[in-house]
Amino acid sequence: APLEPVYPGDNATPEQMAQYAAEMRRYINMLTRPRY
């Protein structure tokens, strides 16, 4: 199973936050993908 992305912290740069958001979206997509 994919690992949950680590939150970069409250003083993360916007780039880090964007990266985290993208990884989180991909992670959630993997979790919710139906398994046929």
Swiss-Prot record:
This is Pancreatic polypeptide. It holds the Pfam family Hormone_3. It is found in: Secreted. It comes from Chinchilla chinchilla (Short-tailed chinchilla). The modification Tyrosine amide is found at Y36. One of its GO terms (molecular function) is neuropeptide Y receptor binding. The keyword Metal-binding does not apply. Gene3D superfamilies: 6.10.250.900. The keyword Secreted applies.
